[in-house]
Regions:
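Beta-propeller blade signature
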Residues: 25-32, 95-99
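Blade-edge beta-strand/turn elements of extracellular beta-propeller
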Residues: 35-47
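Gly/Ser/Thr/Pro-enriched helix-cap/hinge segments flanking short amphipathic alpha-helices
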Residues: 44, 67-201
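Short glycine/acidic-enriched loop and turn motifs that connect beta-strands
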Residues: 14-17, 77-79
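Beta-propeller blade termini
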Residues: 1-2, 54-64, 73
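Residue-level marker for isolated small/hydroxyl-bearing positions within beta-strands
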Residues: 9-13, 71-73
Length: 201
């Protein structure tokens, strides 16, 4: 919802076992900004896909509308008879794409990094965003789930703030770069060592 408070999503599914149903429902919890989380799995539509063997969740703004979407990988449901025979339910292994349709007027910024002296993907870098005295910090890492990875960009919800006071990039080699007075609601590319960033959207 771009309010600056990170919510929690759980991709659930039991490990394959000799007997029993391994399918489970995903869960989504909304952060109210005070450290309390409310279960919004039903109202958000997360439960509409039913119970499956979910394995990992990948976050990205798939449709570039400024709202983070969610793709969940799914294993086929496995049933064993104890004699070495295994049956998989059909159409249970397809991934699920959840499009974020939250009605919000909150602002956001997406940040992409390109290393020059550091690795080109800038893995290991961190980005801090300061808005109205509140700092958010994220790290760009590789391999964040079971055979999956989030989009190679960092996404920050900014609430109703109309300007970003400061963006600081710390590159893997220790170089720090700071940028002030950045406008929200755009995708920005920061290249290591360059004094200016590039607007992508």
């Amino acid at each position: 919802d771009n309010d600056g408070d990170l919510d929690l999503f759980f991709a659930n599914g039991h490990l394959n076992s000799v007997s029993g149903d391994n399918r489970q429902s995903n869960l989504l919890f909304k952060n109210d900004g005070t450290g309390l989380y409310t279960d919004v799995s039903k109202s958000s539509g997360i439960l509409d896909t039913g119970q499956r063997i979910h394995r990992s969740a990948m976050f990205a703004d798939y449709d570039n509308d400024g709202r983070i979407d969610l793709f969940v990988t799914v294993n086929g449901q496995q049933v064993e008879d104890g004699k070495g025979n295994t049956i998989y339910d059909e159409n249970q292994g397809k991934g699920i794409l959840f499009q974020n349709q939250t009605e919000t007027k909150n602002n956001w910024v997406k940040i992409r990094l390109e290393g020059t002296k550091s690795n080109r993907d800038a893995y290991g870098a961190s980005v801090s965003v300061l808005v109205n005295g509140i700092k958010q910090k994220q790290f760009l890492v590789s391999g964040q789930g079971y055979f999956s990875n989030h989009a190679q960009e960092l996404y920050f919800g900014l609430g109703t703030s109309i300007v970003i006071d400061n963006i600081e990039v710390k590159w893997p080699n220790g170089l720090r770069q700071s940028f002030e007075g950045v406008q929200p609601n755009q995708t920005l590319l920061f290249v290591e060592g360059k004094a200016n960033y590039h607007k992508i959207k």
